[in-house]
Regions:
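A structural "hinge/loop" feature
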Residues: 52-74, 94-96, 121, 165, ...
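Structural transition elements
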Residues: 305-306, 318, 334-374, 397-404
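Detector for C-terminal structural segments
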Residues: 217, 224, 317-349, 402-411, ...
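Ligand/substrate-recognition segments at binding pockets and active sites
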Residues: 215, 372-452, 526
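Ligand-site clamp/hinge motif
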Residues: 134, 226-273, 420-422, 428
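Surface-exposed binding/hinge segments that line
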Residues: 99, 143-190
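N-terminal lobe/hinge region of extracytoplasmic solute-binding protein
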Residues: 49-102, 133, 203-204
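Gly/Pro-rich hinge or "lid" segments in bacterial periplasmic/extracellular proteins
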Residues: 67, 75, 85-89, 177-233, ...
Length: 558
């Protein structure tokens, strides 16, 4: 393979340019160990080495692709407007301050006047106004469809004016999706951000700039930008992001001291891998309750998923203890009927937990008319026609093995009570076929994952929606086409305060518990390990880990 090592020389006076990395530099960076790279001068961390299993091929500040895009969930190279703290509360980041009006129709905010783009250009209010107009008009951000004006009120202050109470909705649903300021001099006139693949695509105004990357070695290098110290002094001078083929290899690198911490968005280290790391000196497992979860939804556009009696019976057929062990080892727990885990805002413990009772499931299926008419060991539909459920685990290039194992447990459980089923092999062959299948509702059981980012506000209920509100265009993977469910979902996401959010969130929990339209498969304990021998100031955010927006300002050398 031809070497694809590149270096990005970021000048304060001219736009970003790309030059080949000299061979001596490439050799040094590829063989340098974390022990050598992480030497610190004074109290600063000289170079923090972060491991990931995400690929490093795309470096575009307006996408969420690969390690670069996912690292920017942490206010890394981009000026994210806000971030979520360890308690899941929103805090200012690029915005120096912000307030939401009582009616939820306005956000007032201030910005720094000394921030710079990584090519040396100043960040201005023109960039901020451009950003919101670009997100609304070009990127068609659904949560900004009712944004009527970006009103500049001072040199460093402005207001977002909405015609509907969407302020709370936008800021909460967007904060984990790279809601950041865009460089007008780069993105103006670009209708499709993914088409920009030159070095200028990586320019941001975050606390770090991309210096170089080596796509063969799957490593990238970053340096701090002192002007963009949004939370105070930046204490980590440089960052190296190194990709690994899988979790086992990544954790071996950490045990060997080659990396200091790991970051995989919404993908904590699997329990079986964690068990091999336990007891290793100077490694904190980074344990916390996980707010995300795997879930399954019954396809309700056709029989038998459109029959609540079938869904209730099938629910009792599933071995939740085996699922919990499969997904999270000894740490997994049987989930509740309301889908969302206890670590999520608004969790309703009164709904109780799911139960496994195969005998009860068989009895309920008989009563609902799902009987083995022809004596082949499998039940038919109540009208006597064959029943063979199509099961589709969500496609993933990195965690398909786990999703297939989950599907196997569910399928074996259903098979034991006479429900014939099969995996839709075409749908799990690639992401395009899978998405086309779920979007059309062509499934009987869909297995998906709510990420911790989605769980923080949009919740698992977003995955179950079969209809959006009028005027909104976005992905649809669910088959709940009930007006009350849709209305409660938007009442939750458009709430103007936490009280309204929780009230409507609990209505959604009760809906799925009462209808068994969908169910969680396991409540997990998350592990995001990090080394403790060289640095202090680590903070393990629940469901997120030790790498987040405040890491760059709080981590110091021992």
């Amino acid at each position: 393979m031809k070497k694809k090592t590149v270096s990005l020389l970021l000048s304060l006076a001219v736009c970003l340019t790309m030059l080949p990395v000299q061979g001596v530099f490439a050799a040094e960076t590829e063989t340098e160990t974390a022990a050598e790279a992480s030497e610190s001068t004074g109290n600063h961390v000289e170079n923090l080495v972060i491991g990931t299993i995400a690929d490093q091929n795309v470096f575009n500040s307006l996408t969420q692709s690969d390690a670069f895009g996912r690292m920017n969930y942490n206010g890394f190279t981009q000026g994210d407007f806000v971030y979520r703290d360890e308690n899941n509360n929103l805090q200012p980041y690029f915005w120096k301050s912000f307030t939401i009006s009582d009616d939820g129709k306005q956000i007032d905010f201030t910005i720094p006047l000394d921030a710079v783009w990584h090519d040396g250009e100043p960040v201005t209010m023109d960039d901020v106004v451009f950003t919101f107009e670009y997100m609304r008009d070009v990127r068609k951000n659904g949560s900004l469809q009712n944004l009527t004006e970006v009103k500049v009120t001072g040199d460093d202050s402005a207001s977002l004016i909405f015609s509907e109470p969407d302020a709370y909705y936008w800021i909460n649903s967007s904060c984990n999706n790279n809601a950041c300021v865009y460089a007008k001099h780069i993105w103006e006139g670009i209708d499709d951000p993914t088409t920009l693949d030159g070095p200028e695509a990586a320019i941001g105004c975050g606390p770090y700039k991309l210096v170089s990357y080596d796509s063969d070695a799957q490593v990238s290098y970053y340096e701090a930008v002192p002007e963009n110290a949004f939370l105070g002094e930046i204490t980590v001078d440089k960052v190296t992001v190194q990709s690994y083929s899988d979790e086992t290899t990544l954790m071996m690198a950490m045990m060997n001291g080659d990396i200091d911490a790991m970051y995989n968005y919404a993908n904590p280290i699997d329990a079986d891998v964690i068990d091999t790391v336990k007891g290793t000196p100077d490694i904190d497992l980074g344990e916390s309750a996980f707010s995300g979860c795997y879930q399954m939804e019954y396809g309700k556009d056709r029989a038998p998923g459109n029959d609540q009696a079938f869904r209730e019976a099938a629910s009792f057929a599933i071995d939740y203890n085996q699922l919990a062990t499969t997904i999270n080892g000894e740490y997994g727990k049987v989930p509740g009927k309301g889908v969302i885990p206890p670590s999520c805002k608004g969790y309703d413990e009164s709904l109780g937990s799911l139960e496994f009772d195969a005998d009860k499931a068989a009895e309920m299926l008989d009563e609902a008319g799902y009987k083995d008419v022809d004596g082949d060991g499998y039940r038919e539909l109540p009208d006597g026609s064959p029943m063979d459920l199509s099961v589709i685990p969500q496609y993933s290039s990195k965690s398909m093995d786990m999703r297939n194992r989950i599907a196997e447990v569910i399928m074996n459980s259903l098979d034991k009570v006479g429900i014939k089923n099969h995996v839709d092999s075409d749908s799990i062959s690639n992401s395009e076929i899978w998405e086309d299948t779920v979007t059309k509702g062509n499934y009987d059981i869909s297995i998906t994952l709510t990420t911790s980012g989605m769980a923080s506000y949009s919740t698992a209920f977003r995955y179950f929606m079969g209809e959006l509100r009028e005027g909104e265009s976005s992905w649809l993977w669910g088959t709940i086409r009930d007006d009350s469910f849709r209305d409660n979902y938007y009442a939750m996401t458009q709430a103007v305060n936490d009280e309204q959010y929780i009230e409507n969130n609990q209505k959604l929990q009760k809906y799925v518990a009462d209808t068994m339209a969908a169910e969680a498969l396991c409540w997990e304990t998350a592990f995001f390990p990090y080394r403790t021998d060289k640095y202090t100031g680590w903070e393990n955010y629940p469901s997120w880990g030790a790498v987040h927006a405040t890491t760059w300002y709080r981590l110091t050398a021992k």
